[in-house]
């Protein structure tokens, strides 16, 4: 089954009107908004997380999926490559064949699948609260040091 999360109803309606989709309609599950407390369970049971967004300022869902050990397929645009690093398969979101190819590769290549899981789990560590706090602390110390040198 394919879970389509947090997509506007008008987009789902448009999707379901597509002739090509009639064969798989029974396999689509679109619950709408998903509460944050339910996200980890969904990520943990997912084969992969597809995030073909065209524009994002950061992309927290990418990190959430990675933290749960779920391989990520995401856009090669905007902030996604910087956030995902090697922890995701990057695709052009406007090229459905690239999405299909990425899904097929993850399905058929167990080593590649496991590497994506491992890369994701490693990548997400860079964004821990501890690392973020240490980075801010370093910036503040550098500013303080620079100001003390100027006075």
What feature does the model see in each segment?
Residues 1-151:
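Carbohydrate transferase catalytic cores enriched for Leloir-type hexosyltransferases
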